[in-house]
Regions:
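Sec-dependent signal peptide recognition
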Residues: 2-10
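Acidic/His- and Gly-rich active-site-bordering loop/insert found
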Residues: 22-133, 143-161
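Divalent metal-coordination and catalytic microenvironments
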Residues: 48, 87, 100, 138, ...
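Hydrophobic beta-strand positions in extracellular immunoglobulin-like domains
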Residues: 89, 230-232, 298
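Histidine/acidic-residue-rich, glycine-tolerant segments that coordinate divalent metal ions
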Residues: 121-133, 139-140, 151-152, 157-278, ...
């Protein structure tokens, strides 16, 4: 596309070597292909960043991806989970099947900053006109996986196995009542008649550029949505005794819910977060309303505690409401299950990445409470998910804008680290003499 062609020259001038150069180099042929694709990878990323698309609206993104995969002579399926793309690369020799996944959707965020390729896109979200931005780094995920496909396709005759490239829509969340991208792709038989023995994914994270973070076991939280309706009895604001005040009840419920993680669950063995992010009630300053609506999110790391957590939340909400004379209805909807990296597979993955980047560029870490629907792929296939750092040199995690922030920033040379990590885990499985 024209925008990609224009950006290639600029990207070629600005791409700098990642700080994590290979400790144990890839074969000369692989290394040559890596160096060749780096300017294109940056150009793809800038193109996607300038043209972000919301969940299940990734029409342009998926078209660019599919055209590129076809140019590599991969088997390509489009329209998987509406806008998803799947490419299959068959090596020259038989061997295992693995899958690599990247998510494609952007967020309803208006970008701030002065990047020459910053997003000016707008769209509709929840009935509102919104800015659209790749504020979570998915533009880099897509570009890195396209680059990985390019390198691996150049080595197809030396590969012993098959690689499935999964470009997933709607990681950030489906419309109410719908399925997110990972679950929908699985429901639509994303792998066809292939049976991958492992799947890998990564995510841009505000940590040191040139490093990756590998977390064994629970890595990211499960995420559920909570909807609460508190019903009282409407009355004049000057006569609260004549009714039941659902606003006061909702305030007490919000406070009481904070005892669930701190007093009702094991804070060490079963860390939990309960956040109420929306409260809506009343239409006039001197009327106590009939109802109050609340919405929030629940986060947890231990799948075994989920039902107990639900029970404690429902009990806390309904009994706190009852103490004020009000009633409360609670609905909890699953958004994502915890992302859990199998220790044995993580150990193999970490070793492969350390050989490629150097041990000092591979970090361990603690679980984090954001969620990621890659976990549903892990239910179907053993899988590993890891972070790659995108902070510019000298910028700490505390100083960097977090994911979902209008100033979220990716230090582009970090993408080479991500590419090398993905190639390392792939060639460890299907590389034969190319690993």
């Amino acid at each position: 596309m024209k925008i990609v062609a224009k950006l290639l020259v600029a990207a070629a001038l600005l791409v700098a070597p990642a700080s994590a150069q290979t400790a144990a180099p890839f074969s000369a042929s692989v290394e040559s292909s890596i160096q060749s694709v780096l300017p294109r990878m940056i150009a793809w990323r800038r193109d996607f960043h300038e043209h972000p698309e919301l969940s299940y609206e990734e029409v342009r993104t998926s078209r660019v991806v599919a055209q590129h995969l076809r140019s590599l002579r991969l088997e390509v399926r489009t329209g998987v989970a509406q806008t998803g793309v799947v490419g299959v690369l068959r090596g020259g020799r038989p061997g295992p099947v693995i899958a690599l996944r990247a998510d494609m959707d952007a967020l309803p965020v208006t970008e701030e900053g002065d990047l020459p390729f910053r997003s000016r896109a707008r769209g509709r979200y929840n009935g509102q006109d919104v800015g659209i931005m790749h504020a979570c780094g998915h533009d880099t995920h897509v570009a890195v996986l396209m680059a990985a496909a390019t390198v691996l396709a150049s080595q197809r005759h030396n590969l012993a196995g098959t690689v499935i490239f999964v470009f997933q829509p709607s990681e950030e969340g489906a419309p109410p009542g719908g399925l997110g991208g990972a679950r929908r792709m699985l429901a639509e038989n994303v792998f066809g008649d292939l049976h991958p023995e492992a799947i890998y994914g990564l995510h841009a994270w505000p940590q040191t550029s040139g490093t990756v973070t590998m977390i064994s076991g629970p890595m990211m939280a499960g995420s559920d949505r909570i909807d609460i309706t508190v019903t009282g009895s409407q009355t004049h604001g000057a006569q609260p005794h004549a009714g039941i005040d659902p606003i006061v009840a909702s305030a007490q419920i919000i406070n009481a819910l904070q005892t669930v993680p701190s007093r009702q669950m094991d804070a060490v063995g079963s860390p939990v977060i309960v956040t109420i992010g929306m409260v809506q009630g009343g239409v006039r300053y001197n009327i106590i309303p009939q109802t109050v609506q609340m919405q929030g999110t629940i986060r947890y790391l231990n799948p075994d505690t989920r039902e107990r957590l639900y029970e404690r939340i429902r009990r806390t909400v309904t009994e706190t409401a009852a103490a004020t004379g009000a009633t409360a209805e609670v609905t909890i909807t699953e958004n994502a299950i915890p992302t859990v990296n199998p220790p044995a597979l993580m150990a193999r993955t970490r070793a492969a990445v350390a050989r490629a980047l150097g041990e000092d560029h591979v970090n361990s870490g603690l679980p984090v409470m954001p969620a990621e629907d890659f976990a549903y792929f892990q239910q179907a296939v053993p899988g590993v998910f890891f972070f790659y750092g995108v902070n510019p040199p000298g910028v700490t995690q505390a100083e960097a804008a977090p994911n979902h922030n209008p100033r979220f920033f990716v230090h582009e040379p970090a993408m080479e680290t991500a590419l090398r990590a993905m190639l390392a885990v792939t060639l460890d499985r299907v590389g034969g003499e190319q690993r």
